UniProtKB/Swiss-Prot annotation:
UniProt keyword annotation of Disulfide bond present: yes
Domain Kazal-like: 4-54
Species in which this protein is naturally found: Podargus strigoides
PANTHER family linked: OVOMUCOID-LIKE-RELATED, SERINE PEPTIDASE INHIBITOR, KAZAL TYPE 2, TANDEM DUPLICATE 1-RELATED
SMART domains: KAZAL
Protein name as annotated: Ovomucoid
Cellular compartments annotated: Secreted
S-S pairs: C6-C36, C14-C33, C22-C54
Domain of life: Eukaryota
Keyword Disulfide bond: yes
Listed GO CC annotations: extracellular region
Site keyed Reactive bond 3: positions: G16, D17
Free-text domain note: Avian ovomucoid consists of three homologous, tandem Kazal family inhibitory domains.
């Protein structure tokens, strides 16, 4: 199972890096920062499906 450490999030500003991750909501997040901010917003209900685009 793929996991991402989001313990340092949320971050107020995400860089523009493009390293896509696919969330359990079937949305593609452009990078770890955007994904982790969404995880925090979801109170931990959002998880990582896999690395790469959905």
């Amino acid at each position: 199972i793929a996991t991402v450490d989001c313990s340092d999030y949320p971050q107020p500003v995400c860089m523009g890096d493009y390293m896509p991750l696919c969330g359990s909501d079937s949305k593609t997040y452009s990078n770890k920062c955007n994904f982790c901010n969404a995880v925090v917003d979801s109170n931990g209900t959002l998880t990582l499906n896999h690395f790469g685009k959905c």
